[in-house]
Amino acid sequence: MARIAGVDIPRDKRVVISLTYVFGIGRTTAQQVLKEAGVSEDTRVRDLTEEELGKIRDVIDKLKVEGDLRREVSLNIKRLIEIGSYRGIRHRRGLPVRGQNSKNNARTRKGPRRTVANKKK
């Protein structure tokens, strides 16, 4: 397995797909990285030379990926919570942040239902 940005990428897949295993690199970014490194998208990872791997690593080192990106995202969320913005409050309460309806759905964000017992009349 080739190791890029601290992640073991699968050898049997095409390079453009394998690069998406790195957090912060999707299909589009992977295509741009390969274009800049001068590597064909159809090449399998096992067929890459050390020189090509080095070029890919150099291009990816310029990007914010893995730990740095995760840290930046968490700091952004922490900042929203500290300034008390609407989005920060939604993050703190564990509710949807982007305006989705939360009366009936939003189960992914809210977690499993907590049933409330009925009062006897």
UniProtKB/Swiss-Prot annotation:
GO aspect biological process, one term: translation
Endpoints of the signal sequence: none
Disulfide bond residue pairs: none
Keyword rRNA-binding set for record: yes
UniProt entry keywords in alphabetical sequence: Ribonucleoprotein, Ribosomal protein, RNA-binding, rRNA-binding, tRNA-binding
An example Gene Ontology CC term for this record: small ribosomal subunit
Subunit structure: Part of the 30S ribosomal subunit. Forms a loose heterodimer with protein S19. Forms two bridges to the 50S subunit in the 70S ribosome.
Entry protein name: Small ribosomal subunit protein uS13
Gene that this polypeptide is encoded by: rpsM
